[in-house]
Each structure stands twice: as C-alpha cells, then as structure tokens.
Amino acid sequence: QIQDAYMQATAGQRPYFFDHIEAITDTCLAEYAGLTGRSYQRVATFKLEDADYVIVGMGSMIVQAECVADYLRETRKLKVGVVNLTMFRPFPGDLLGHALRGKKGVVVLERTDQPLAEDLPLMREVRATLIKCIENGMAPDDERPFPTYASYAAGDMPRLYSGCYGLGSR
C-alpha cells in the first residue's frame, strides 16, 4: 500500500460519503417508518421539551432511563428528560446540540470504562458537540463554523456529568 494513495483515499471519503450520510439516513428512516409503522430518528427524545436535566445514552438502557425520568418527575418534582442516540456514526451533533441547549445538567451514561481516558467515548462526542455550539455562538451568524449546529451563548452550556454502568453485569 502506498502511503500517499492511502491518505488520499481516506481524505477523499469525507466529501463523497460523510457529507451525505445524514440526509440519506433520515430518508431511509422515513421510508422504513412508511413500510413498517415503526418510526426511528437519529436522536430520539423523551419528555425533553420542559426538562432541566437530561440523561443521554444509547441502547437498552433507554427504557430504564425513561422510567427514572418519570420517577424523578413524580417523586422529586425534577424535570428530567432522556435523549436516546440511536445512531453513533456519524455522530448526530447537529440534533444533539439543539436538544441540549439551555439545559441545567446532562448526565452521559455509557456501558464502558476507559480508566486512563479523559472522557468515555460518548462523553467525548457530547463535549465536542457542545464546544462546536459555543464556537458557533462566538462567530457572526453568517460565519458560523458549524452551520447545522445550534449556536450557544455562555449560559446555554449545561453542566456535564459522566457515568458508566453494566460492567460485569453490575
């Protein structure tokens, strides 16, 4: 394998594949819903509209997270919502940034641990998304570096918390 060819092939994938995959995915999910009656999105939300606090996760933990949100709303009067990331790559930062804007706190729960890492994989992506939103907020509207992402003022950034679960079936 020639190094230049590998570099060019890797870099060349982005404009021809990555830039279109979100729209293609949305179209496929809509067609799937039409065929089966089951609707999916790249990011699904539960009671997020009025939520102050958000649980972000993926996969089978979402059912329990929704139960926790209901329980905390009923017993503690905390406005908790849930974000289910049904698609990890490409990361749906465009949708997530809008969903988390102005929330007080966000806990990102993952079924993994990386003891020497700064952040767990999902938290890295969430943090990168919110930083892009802050960068948009610092730029003039016509020069936003990430045009599909939300634009955050300093007060729109939620506090972030990270947790892991289900390690060794615990």
Residue ranges and their predicted role:
Residues G93-Q114:
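A structural-propensity feature for long, helix-poor, extended segments
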